[in-house]
């Protein structure tokens, strides 16, 4: 499907950007094709009227742990113990995976189109990335780091 985003205020993300109006953003196959004057013939596009709302380039979050909501912890917790509990049964793994998928979707709905995961639960991040790419889940692009590396202590 081809879309034309109209009646929006465009912020282009450049250093000296100025809000731009009277333009349409043309999207084909999920990618921006062009930005054209709003007088352009749009008969091949489904019109999405932004009603004066802002539109800007997708944001990138370069440090994400999808196992958490991103909100500050109210108190210190033993993460290793918590991970062991979560990963100990199929029920808790299923619940945790649904939460991880929800946190990723929240990122996308907040304007973040790419997240860089830097450690998560088991293979959740990789599985979610694959499901998003297959179109079975909704979420941002995810370059996955999978697991962390630890250097041995040098005596």
What are these regions (language model features)?
Residues 97-99, 141-142, 149:
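Acidic, metal/ion-coordinating pockets
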Residues 135-140:
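Alpha-helix-loop-beta-strand connector modules within alpha/beta enzyme cores
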Residues 147-153:
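Conserved small/polar residues in nucleotide/adenosyl-binding loops
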Residues 8, 25, 30, 52, ...:
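Divalent metal-coordination and catalytic microenvironments
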Residues 26, 50, 56-59, 151:
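Generic leucine side-chain signal with a strong bias for well-ordered alpha-helical environments
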Residues 4, 45-49, 142-144:
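Conserved beta-strand scaffold positions in the cores of enzyme catalytic domains, especially
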Residues 1-41, 55:
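N-terminal metal-binding scaffold of metallo-dependent hydrolase/deaminase domains
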Residues 54-131:
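Metal-associated gating/positioning segment near the N- to mid-region
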């Amino acid at each position: 499907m081809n879309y034309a985003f109209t009646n929006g205020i465009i912020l282009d993300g450049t250093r000296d950007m100025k809000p731009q109006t009277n333009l349409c953003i043309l999207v084909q196959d999920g990618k921006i094709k062009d930005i054209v004057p709003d007088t352009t013939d749009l008969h091949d596009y489904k019109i999405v009227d932004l009603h004066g709302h802002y539109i800007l380039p997708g944001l990138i979050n370069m440090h994400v742990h999808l196992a958490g909501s991103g909100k500050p912890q109210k108190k210190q917790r033993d993460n290793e113990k918590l991970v062991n509990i979560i990963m100990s049964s199929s029920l808790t793994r299923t619940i945790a995976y649904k939460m991880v998928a929800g946190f990723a979707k929240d990122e996308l709905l907040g304007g973040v189109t790419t997240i860089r995961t830097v450690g998560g639960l088991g293979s959740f991040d990789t599985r979610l990335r694959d499901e998003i790419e297959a179109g079975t889940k909704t979420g941002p692009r995810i370059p996955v780091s999978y697991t962390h590396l630890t250097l041995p202590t040098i005596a």
